Curated annotation (Swiss-Prot):
Consists of 3 domains; the N-terminus binds the ribosome, the middle domain has PPIase activity, while the C-terminus has intrinsic chaperone activity on its own. This is Trigger factor. GO terms for cellular component: cytoplasm. It holds the Pfam family Trigger_N. It comes from Mycobacteroides abscessus (strain ATCC 19977 / DSM 44196 / CCUG 20993 / CIP 104536 / JCM 13569 / NCTC 13031 / TMC 1543 / L948). Its main location: cytoplasm. PANTHER family: TRIGGER FACTOR CHAPERONE AND PEPTIDYL-PROLYL CIS/TRANS ISOMERASE, TRIGGER FACTOR-LIKE PROTEIN TIG, CHLOROPLASTIC. Transmembrane segments: none annotated. Keywords: Cell cycle, Cell division, Chaperone, Cytoplasm, Isomerase, Rotamase. GO terms for biological process: 'de novo' cotranslational protein folding; cell division; chaperone-mediated protein folding; protein transport; protein unfolding. It comes from the Bacteria. Residues 433-490 are annotated as: Disordered. One of its GO terms (molecular function) is ribosome binding. Residues 454-477 have a biased composition (Basic and acidic residues).
Length: 490
């Protein structure tokens, strides 16, 4: 077999392949065996009919067609391997000549990874936000925790932001009742924004037993996107009372003995989330810095496929109704033209990033082993709240394991670049890249992965093993006493 490569553009080639018929003998043998099972000839058992009789029955052209169709994929793969091109997507194959007994020739046009020349990676410099925790952020975390242990108390006043109300709802569109919008005794936290637009504003100021009519656009159902007159009636109003932020609360709501220890733990949790955000920023800024230095042509066919996939995802929640998408964009002060432009720019950057990271992975000869994949699968299973084996089963069924391999390899590639780059925060301080990336080996060796894994671990008090049982006993006793005092108060 002979093959040559024509470069049609920086991202597309035509591979010309010539296959002597002598090399197709195994394909002919296979074709005759398959035909022998399919075609019944008098006097011969299934699978035993001679090739000449089979050919006489179905015709030489049918045999050739079967041989060629079976031979093309393998011969194309051989030609790709011999040419050292890196295809992107499926080829467009055209048989140009079948000279029976002599030669088969075909061409395969395919998008390929362009040649990308990497700059000196040690010259890459990025600046990111520092990891700092404000007292107000810790207080917000503490308030959120207190809210989980709060109690609701009925009030005899107008509803305010943050109150919990029981409401009845009904709606009409052009005088027609919207049945799916009618409900009674619905519990709602004012200010949560979890229900329809305009509801919170309508409720605030109402007392129990009062109602109000307001106009809003329905987001779902038969009348989605249409203006509706909504009537809301308040049944009851309750406010949430928060427990005092003291040592008793710390013991009730956590494994800590003092409010100071609890605040320290909350501080570390906030810091952990900010480290994840910083890691993501380092990754994004590093990629942007590289893309600014390198010209990367994008295959047009691959780009159009990516845009099509992104659009499919965008309208999936709208029952694939692009008119509804256009209406939503208009409501947001945007337009379909701006949306399409942003989508094209986003898809272009995404493809350039993937091409770039693949080249970097090749440069550093990055491999992905079983431990790499296991680490990533464990991390993903924590995020999704399922067992790793369930995740593996799902990815296998969806044929997404090869994609996972590629993602891990690209993650390790950007980690190598970050290690060579100069990373500082906006205060001018150097960022500890090793703390961001974690250990060099492993699939979690990606910006943010180590910090993300750490975020999953619950904060724990640093106590010695010898005192652990005593601490638990004392804490149980304190909680018991606190509960008794609360019961007496009631």
């Amino acid at each position: 077999m002979k093959s040559t490569v024509e470069k049609l553009s920086p991202t597309r080639v035509r591979i010309n392949v010539e296959v002597p018929f002598a090399e197709l003998e195994p394909d002919f043998s296979k074709a005759y065996k398959e035909l022998a099972q399919q075609v019944r000839l008098p006097g011969f058992r299934p699978g035993k009919a001679p090739a000449k009789l089979l050919e006489a029955r179905v015709g030489r052209a049918a045999v050739l067609e079967q041989v060629v169709n079976a031979a093309l994929p393998a011969r194309y793969s051989e030609a790709v391997t011999a040419s050292d091109v890196k295809p992107l997507g499926q080829p467009e194959i055209e048989v140009t000549k079948i000279e029976d007994g002599q030669e088969l020739t075909f061409t395969a046009e395919v998008d390929v990874r362009p040649e990308i020349e990497l700059p000196d990676l040690s010259g890459v410099a990025v600046t990111v936000k520092p990891v700092t925790v404000e007292d107000s952020e810790v207080e917000a975390e503490l308030d959120a925790l207190r809210a989980r242990f709060g109690t609701l108390k009925g009030v005899e006043r107008a509803a305010e932001n943050g109150d919990f109300v029981s409401i009845d709802l009904s709606a009409t569109v052009d005088g027609k009742e919207v049945e799916e919008a009618a409900t009674t005794g619905l519990s709602h936290e004012i200010g949560s924004g979890q229900l329809i637009d305009g509801l919170d504003e309508a409720i605030i100021g109402l007392k129990a037993g009062e109602e109000k009519v307001f106009t809003t656009k329905l987001a779902a159902g038969e009348f989605a996107g249409q203006e509706a007159e909504v009537t809301v009636k308040v049944g009851s109003i309750k406010e949430r009372e928060l427990p005092d932020a003291d040592d008793d609360f710390a013991q009730l709501a956590s494994e800590f003995d003092t409010i100071g220890e609890l605040k320290d733990s909350l501080t570390e949790q906030v810091k952990g989330r900010k480290r994840i955000a910083q890691a993501d920023e380092i990754r994004d800024e590093t990629i942007t810095a590289l893309l600014d230095k390198i010209e990367i042509p994008v295959p047009e066919k691959i780009l159009e496929e990516q845009i099509g996939n992104n659009l499919h995802e965008a309208v999936h929640g709208l029952d694939h109704n692009e008119e509804r998408l256009n209406e939503l964009l208009q409501e947001q002060g945007s337009s379909r033209e701006e949306f399409d432009k942003d989508m094209r720019e986003s898809a272009t950057k995404s493809i350039k990033t993937e091409l770039l990271l693949d080249v970097i992975a090749d440069k550093f000869d990055i491999n992905v082993d079983q431990q790499d994949l296991t680490e990533r699968l464990v991390l993903m299973s924590r995020q999704y709240g399922i067992e790793p084996q369930q995740l593996v089963q799902y990815l296998t069924q969806q044929q997404q394991l090869p994609g996972l391999y590629v993602d891990v390899r690209r993650g390790k590639a950007i980690a190598e670049v970050i290690r060579q780059a100069k990373v500082t925060d906006s205060t001018g301080a150097d960022v500890d890249v090793d703390a961001v990336l974690g250990p060099r080996r492993g699939g979690a060796d990606e910006a943010g992965a180590e910090a993300e894994a750490a975020e999953e671990k619950p904060a724990k008090a640093k106590k010695s093993a010898d005192s652990e049982k005593t601490d638990k006993s004392e804490k149980a006793e304190k909680k018991s006493k606190k509960k008794s005092k609360d019961d007496d108060a009631e």
